[in-house]
């Protein structure tokens, strides 16, 4: 933590020393280029409302956290191009925010020493569906929920494969891959992108052909904030039945009981038919002692099994009871509905029992209620975990009432799509992915260090049971514990093209976590970064560094 504390201090110092002239220059440039929707720290009346609207992890809302000098909300591609031009001209670092769900706050906080701005894409959220071609264009600021809603308005037999959080921005989600309940059937969100419009650091609007296949490959799964700003994605619509089945299955019990179910789950779920996804959310029971131990079988762990099946309830019951009788799925634990209703059912808009208002227009809401403080980490499991290993999971989980685990099953299309098809590499050979989470509220924030140490200790305890050499991680669940390249960015900005050794060092240092996220695809991502953004204009604490080598200074033009 020591280097991070030092860099936070540098960032705060740089903020306090930001020249009034630089602020004036950027403000004037934006206005001269017809960009009028922006707020300035700390004088603009609505600055903090804008900052916090899409700030989803309250760990980064603390007063001592670095603040952007500007928050800019472009509403057209012309304004977006002008925004990039003006920010570069005034020497402001750019952070791009779509939905603000970055696990480490990289879309709205910078620990670099430079003054920075947020380019917020919330005004670029149009979704245009073309059923004839079974495609849609979604602007980079559209949320997943907005995409789902737009599709459902014109078809009840089409869907898109993405995550369950409707307020998550498509720009970041698709850039990192985008796993969801349809991924075993259709692959990731990024697997279903057929074209894109990318605005690079030189203000060029590039489609797939213009950007080239290496860059188009990189923007699908290579992580957000690296390549430029995606103005829009062209996505493939996916055929689904009119009726699907959802299940929420609760099986609270002792650690021994839950471990037995999980031991079977890890074998069954990767081999289910592709139409069937069965994930698990685990949390400590956290019950009063008289309730927890009042029965002969103690309730220590509370598992929630979430199932989506692309077909009728009768088939769900038949398949589950044949392949996984230990779970004992009951008729009243499952419901038939349309696909878009299932998206609402599994979203944060539903209550703990999956109940919702049934109003699918709620999927368009951008603001997320119930924000909290959280820290996440990820792993991939390639070999079945023993009963003792499962018990180890649960013993560690029980230690923290603010902790929980999410198990996402792989197999199906995730096995069939090549690990080099897009930049996201975690494919065949993975049984399931693990997400570790500690989440707390303001009243508990005095315990934040305890929760952070718990999740790091849990992660270390899991080492024998998960992938290795390298240990895998998912870029959409950023984890700064794996390393940061703030020093690398400083070197890159100050290195000359005739002295490439610093860029080589930066690439090699970033390899430590870059290969955890991208495995063997890391070097190709460096190549793509060097091609599209050699001056490292678009960067954050875990972005892909370019190689400098023969790079020449680009002359930026807004024309």
Swiss-Prot record:
Main location class: other
EC id: 1.1.1.-
Glycan-modified residues: 25, 37, 321, 355, 494
Single Gene Ontology MF annotation: oxidoreductase activity
GO cellular component, one term: plant-type vacuole
Gene induction: By jasmonic acid (MeJA).
Residue stretches making up the FAD-binding PCMH-type domain: 64-240
EC primary class: oxidoreductase
Pfam families (alphabetical): BBE, FAD_binding_4
Pathway: Alkaloid biosynthesis; nicotine biosynthesis
Tissue and organ expression note: Mostly expressed in roots.
Signal peptide: 1-21
Family: Belongs to the oxygen-dependent FAD-linked oxidoreductase family.
Result of knocking out the encoding gene: Strongly reduced nicotine biosynthesis but accumulation of dihydromethanicotine. Inhibition of jasmonate-elicited formation of anatabine and other pyridine alkaloids.
Keywords assigned by UniProt, alphabetized: Alkaloid metabolism, Disulfide bond, FAD, Flavoprotein, Glycoprotein, Oxidoreductase, Signal, Vacuole
Matches recorded under InterPro entries: BBE, FAD-bd_PCMH, FAD-bd_PCMH-like_sf, FAD-bd_PCMH_sub1, FAD-bd_PCMH_sub2, Oxid_FAD_bind_N
Cofactor: FAD
Role summary: Involved in the biosynthesis of pyridine alkaloid natural products, leading mainly to the production of anabasine, anatabine, nicotine and nornicotine, effective deterrents against herbivores with antiparasitic and pesticide properties (neurotoxins); nornicotine serves as the precursor in the synthesis of the carcinogen compound N'-nitrosonornicotine (NNN). Catalyzes a late oxidation step subsequent to the pyridine ring condensation reaction in the biosynthesis of alkaloids.
Record PANTHER family: OS08G0158400 PROTEIN
Gene: BBLA
GO BP annotations, alphabetical order: alkaloid biosynthetic process; nicotine biosynthetic process; response to jasmonic acid
Record-given protein name: Berberine bridge enzyme-like A
Pros-8alpha-FAD histidine: modified positions: 101
Cysteine-cysteine disulfides: 29-86
Annotated localization: Vacuole
């Amino acid at each position: 933590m020591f280097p991070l504390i030092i860099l936070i201090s540098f960032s705060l110092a740089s903020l306090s020393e930001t020249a009034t002239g630089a602020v004036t220059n950027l403000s004037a440039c934006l206005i001269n280029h017809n960009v009028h929707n922006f707020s300035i720290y700390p004088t603009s009346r609505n600055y903090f409302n804008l900052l916090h609207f899409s700030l989803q992890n309250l760990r980064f809302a603390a007063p001592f956290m670095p603040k952007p000098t500007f928050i800019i909300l472009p509403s057209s591609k012309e304004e977006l191009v002008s925004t990039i031009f003006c920010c570069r001209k005034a020497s402001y670092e750019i952070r791009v925010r779509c939905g603000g769900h970055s696990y480490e706050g990289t879309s709205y906080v910078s620990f670099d020493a430079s003054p920075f701005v947020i380019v917020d894409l919330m005004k670029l959220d149009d979704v245009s569906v073309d059923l004839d071609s079974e495609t849609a264009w979604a602007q980079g600021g559209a949320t997943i929920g907005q995409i789902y809603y737009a599709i459902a308005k014109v078809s009840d037999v089409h869907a898109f494969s993405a995550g369950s959080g409707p307020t998550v921005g498509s720009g970041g989600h698709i850039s990192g891959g985008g796993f969801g309940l349809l991924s075993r059937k259709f692959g990731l969100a990024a697997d279903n992108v057929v074209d894109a419009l990318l605005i690079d650091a030189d203000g060029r609007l590039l489609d797939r052909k213009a950007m080239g296949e290496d860059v188009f490959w990189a923007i699908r799964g290579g992580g957000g904030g690296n390549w430029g700003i995606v103005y829009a994605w062209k996505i493939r619509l996916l055929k689904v039945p009119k009726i699907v089945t959802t299940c929420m299955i609760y099986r609270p019990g002792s650690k021994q009981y839950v471990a037995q179910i999980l031991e079977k789950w890890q074998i069954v779920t990767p081999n289910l038919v592709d139409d069937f996804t069965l994930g698990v959310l685990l949390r400590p029971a956290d019950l009063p002692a008289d309730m927890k131990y009042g029965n002969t079988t103690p309730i220590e762990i509370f598992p929630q099994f979430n199932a989506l099946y692309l077909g009728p309830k009768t088939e769900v019951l038949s398949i589950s009871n044949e392949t996984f009788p230990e779970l004992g799925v009951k008729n009243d634990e499952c419901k038939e509905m349309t696909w878009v209703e299932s998206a609402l059912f599994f979203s944060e808009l539903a209550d703990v029992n999956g109940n919702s208002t049934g109003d699918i227009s709620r999927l368009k809401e951008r603001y997320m209620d119930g924000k909290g403080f959280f820290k996440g980490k990820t792993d991939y499991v390639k070999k079945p975990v023993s009963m003792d290993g499962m018990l180890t999971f649960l013993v560690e989980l029980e230690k923290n009432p603010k902790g929980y685990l999410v198990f996402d099953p792989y197999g199906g299309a995730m096995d069939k799509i090549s690990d080099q098809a897009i930049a996201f590499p975690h494919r065949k050979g993975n049984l399931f992915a693990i997400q570790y989470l500690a989440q707390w509220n303001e009243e508990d924030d005095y315990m934040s260090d305890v929760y952070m140490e718990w999740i790091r200790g849990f992660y270390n305890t899991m080492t024998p049971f998960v992938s290795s050499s390298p240990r895998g991680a998912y870029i959409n669940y950023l984890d700064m514990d794996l390393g940061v390249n703030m020093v690398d960015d400083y070197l890159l900005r100050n290195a000359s093209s005739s002295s490439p050794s610093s860029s080589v060092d930066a690439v090699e240092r970033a390899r430590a976590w870059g290969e955890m996220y991208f495995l063997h695809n890391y070097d190709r991502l460096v190549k793509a970064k060097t091609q599209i953004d050699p001056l490292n204009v678009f960067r954050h604490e875990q972005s892909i560094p370019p190689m400098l080598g023969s790079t020449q200074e680009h002359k930026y033009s807004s024309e």
